[in-house]
Amino acid sequence: ADLLVTLFSKDYGKIMATAYGIRKSKKRDVISLNPLNKVEVTLIQKNNYYIVKDVEIIQNFKHIMKDIEKLEISLYVLDSIDKIYYTTDENGDFFDKLVEILSFIDVLPYIKKGYKYYILLSFLRRIMIEQGIYDINEISLILEKEKSENIRKYKEILKISKNSLENSEIQEKMEMYVDFLKKIVIIFEDFIN
């Protein structure tokens, strides 16, 4: 019954900690450590290791857990952050953006396939900008190498997101670009890695 958890905090960055005996606990701590909860955690540091002493849920993204599309996107976002950010990289702004994107996903009434890829693309673009690796000229070269129409499609997608007011309108328009959005997400993933 021990649980190794990865915590992403506003003030201390990414922290690895162990919750001893949590799976045997009759308290709700094991539920509190669900990856889709914003929690307040009390940690004890022994040598270079952290131990979870207490956990309290601050915000629960409960609607994400009820929709497989929302769950898929949210877990992808968390997995990406886990791979990109190193332990103790403090970044309060990015933490706030992470909570913002999870809150956004949580309140969406539905997610169409094209919009799902659009959210992932927007998230990856945000990470690339944050990490200082977003270079539109280099991305344009990669897109152009595959097909020259790719740049046109990418610009159309950016226009849709700027010019559309309603979420439902954006979702409908993104359906025309499902395959292209999926391809761009893969290109962005490769670019980050």
Which functions belong to the PLM regions below?
Residues A1-L3, F8-N193:
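Non-catalytic alpha-helical scaffolds and adjoining flexible linkers that form interface surfaces
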